[in-house]
Regions:
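Short, surface-exposed helix-loop/turn micro-motifs enriched in polar/charged residues
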Residues: 86, 180-183, 199
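A glycine-rich helix N-cap at a beta->alpha junction
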Residues: 196-213
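N-terminal amphipathic, basic helical "cap/leader" segment at the start of enzyme domains
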Residues: 1-133
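Solvent-exposed coil/turn segments that connect beta secondary-structure elements
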Residues: 99-101, 142, 212
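Glycine-centered structural positions embedded in regular secondary structure
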Residues: 8-13, 163, 207-210
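Short coil/turn connectors at secondary-structure junctions
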Residues: 131-135, 200-201
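Small-aliphatic-rich amphipathic alpha-helix that forms the alpha element of a beta-alpha
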Residues: 48, 67, 94, 137-191
Length: 213
């Protein structure tokens, strides 16, 4: 679907998911992440870039596991994360749009939990490449976890947290031969409806990840 068509559908409130490809498992248990792989940090920084051309090849679970752990996994026994959040609110949820369905990343159990048995990839952005890339991440702020943050500042605080997660994804991608791009030109209402979000949840950004084309 072209960008222009998607934008027109979005303006009409008609940007919809596609049927899932294959079975939508209620959960996907991820293997333990490899915390010793990838490039050294300075080399990954040197290779960090945005890419908008993706192969359709599926990422193996082992690589998806490392990607999600690097993005926002737990890296301390007390539940600390790989990306910061103000007052440790941990208000960001990472959703993963796959051909088989949309999942929420559960960092505590390091697994994916099904939230929608549809292929939501084309809903995650107006760009045409999001439809066929193997996965699209969506960063959602849950304002109900931000009671200690003034209401008027919650979106700003959460956006900073989402940006830190996105940079983790960039560095993991650079260090593991993947392509990625962060995206803010998205239909937030369509994404929220497709994911079944509540009024306390706010869609912030999307990020496409895959092998370079």
């Amino acid at each position: 679907m072209t960008t222009l068509t998607k934008f027109a559908l979005g303006m009409m409130g008609q940007l919809r998911p596609k049927p899932a490809q294959g079975d939508s498992a209620t959960s996907l248990i991820l293997p333990p992440p490899d915390k010793h792989g990838g490039l050294p940090l300075m080399e990954a920084l040197a290779k960090r870039r945005s890419s908008r051309e993706f192969a359709r090849d599926t990422l193996p679970l082992s690589l998806l596991s490392g990607l999600l752990w690097a993005a926002y996994g737990e890296n301390r026994s007390e539940g600390g994360r790989t990306a910061p959040s103000a007052l440790n609110a941990q208000e960001i949820d990472v959703f993963v749009a796959l051909p088989s369905g949309a999942y929420r990343y559960d960092a505590a159990d390091h697994e994916l939990r099904l939230v929608a048995a549809n292929d939501l990839r084309r809903v995650t952005g107006y760009q045409d490449f999001v439809d066929e890339a193997p996965l699209d991440l969506v960063y959602v702020a849950d304002h109900s976890r931000m009671n200690r943050v003034p209401v008027g500042q919650r979106t700003s605080y959460a956006s900073v947290a989402a940006g830190a997660i996105a940079q983790n994804v960039y560095l993991f991608s650079a260090g593991n031969g993947l392509a990625t791009v962060i995206r803010a030109w998205i239909d937030r209402n369509a994404i929220a409806n497709a994911l079944g979000l509540t009024h306390d949840q706010e869609v912030l950004l999307s990020q496409t990840v895959g092998y370079p084309k």
